[in-house]
């Protein structure tokens, strides 16, 4: 019978993932901290923090794991039309804290409260400052109406949370992000647990062991993110020079069809 392990504050190592509980699925360890070093260590092995106010820090590695290949994103006819005609401007890393705050405060059906605590917000904001965590923002007439954030390690993007305040905002944002990740050579988007919404984009569940093998292959790869050169995306009608990886700042408006 598996038993939860309390993490040592001075030791970044996690217990083997096969020791995670089956009920609740994937609960692996308790305690530790949200330091950048521990978070990078955890994500590189497919482990992520998920807990609510009043709970101890909980670490998870569910089995199966839901993942999406950026190159295999499904875009139906309605979404392709929306991508050609949407009224939004999409940016990256221009309002990370605002996106994370919105993800933590927006009301969601079937959920009471949020798992995005102030401690979590501070930790991921620091990762963004370090160039490890990134956000995508969807704007409508200078108002933030949608977005998402996550962690980028090698050629894997670990999605954390998303929000939408108007119809179509999250679909446009997520689709554009996946296209950009594909252009940059990313192999995998970690969606953590099953979501019907993400399944509509082509996300699928795979065994945890398979997921971990994919991480071992791709977490240490170097993505094709431009550093000094001007990047021209096939999606937008406007773009601007892309700074180094520590700042993915770019902007899109409605553009060409995505096949």
UniProtKB/Swiss-Prot annotation:
Main location: cytoplasm
Known catalytic reactions: N-terminal L-lysyl-[protein] + L-leucyl-tRNA(Leu) = N-terminal L-leucyl-L-lysyl-[protein] + tRNA(Leu) + H(+); N-terminal L-arginyl-[protein] + L-leucyl-tRNA(Leu) = N-terminal L-leucyl-L-arginyl-[protein] + tRNA(Leu) + H(+); L-phenylalanyl-tRNA(Phe) + an N-terminal L-alpha-aminoacyl-[protein] = an N-terminal L-phenylalanyl-L-alpha-aminoacyl-[protein] + tRNA(Phe)
Superkingdom classification of source: Bacteria
GO cellular component assignments: cytoplasm
Pfam families in UniProt: Leu_Phe_trans
Record-linked Gene3D superfamilies: Leucyl/phenylalanyl-tRNA-protein transferase, C-terminal domain, Leucyl/phenylalanyl-tRNA-protein transferase, N-terminal domain
Enzyme Commission code: 2.3.2.6
InterPro entries the UniProt entry points to: Acyl_CoA_acyltransferase, Leu/Phe-tRNA_Trfase, Leu/Phe-tRNA_Trfase_C, Leu/Phe-tRNA_Trfase_N
Molecular-function GO terms, alphabetical: leucyl-tRNA--protein transferase activity
Keywords (A to Z) from UniProt: Acyltransferase, Cytoplasm, Transferase
Location within or outside the cell: Cytoplasm
GO biological process, one term: protein catabolic process
Functional summary from the UniProt entry: Functions in the N-end rule pathway of protein degradation where it conjugates Leu, Phe and, less efficiently, Met from aminoacyl-tRNAs to the N-termini of proteins containing an N-terminal arginine or lysine.
Protein family: Belongs to the L/F-transferase family.
Protein name: Leucyl/phenylalanyl-tRNA--protein transferase
């Amino acid at each position: 019978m598996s038993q939860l392990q309390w993490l040592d504050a001075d030791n970044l190592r996690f217990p083997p993932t096969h020791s995670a509980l089956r009920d609740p699925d994937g609960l692996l360890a308790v305690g530790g901290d949200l330091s950048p070093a521990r978070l990078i260590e955890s994500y590189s092995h497919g482990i992520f923090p998920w807990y609510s106010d009043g709970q101890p820090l909980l670490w998870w590695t569910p089995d199966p794991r839901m993942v999406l290949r950026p190159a295999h994103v499904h875009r139906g006819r309605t979404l392709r039309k929306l991508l050609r005609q949407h009224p939004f401007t999409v940016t990256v890393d221009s309002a990370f804290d605002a996106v994370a705050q919105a993800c933590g405060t927006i009301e969601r059906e079937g959920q009471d409260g949020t798992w995005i605590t102030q401690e979590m917000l501070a930790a991921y904001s620091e990762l963004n400052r370090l160039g490890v965590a990134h956000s995508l923002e969807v704007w409508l007439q200078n108002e933030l109406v949608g977005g998402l954030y996550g962690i980028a390690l090698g050629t894997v993007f670990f999605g954390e949370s998303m929000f939408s305040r108007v119809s179509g905002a999250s679909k446009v944002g997520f689709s554009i992000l996946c296209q950009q990740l594909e252009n940059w050579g990313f192999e995998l988007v970690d969606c953590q647990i099953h979501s019907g919404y993400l399944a509509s984009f082509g996300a699928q569940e795979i065994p945890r062991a398979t997921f971990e093998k994919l991480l071992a292959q791709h977490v240490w790869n170097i993505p094709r993110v431009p550093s000094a050169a001007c990047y021209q995306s096939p999606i937008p009608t406007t773009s601007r020079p892309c700074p180094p990886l520590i700042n993915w700042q770019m902007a899109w408006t409605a553009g060409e069809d995505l096949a």
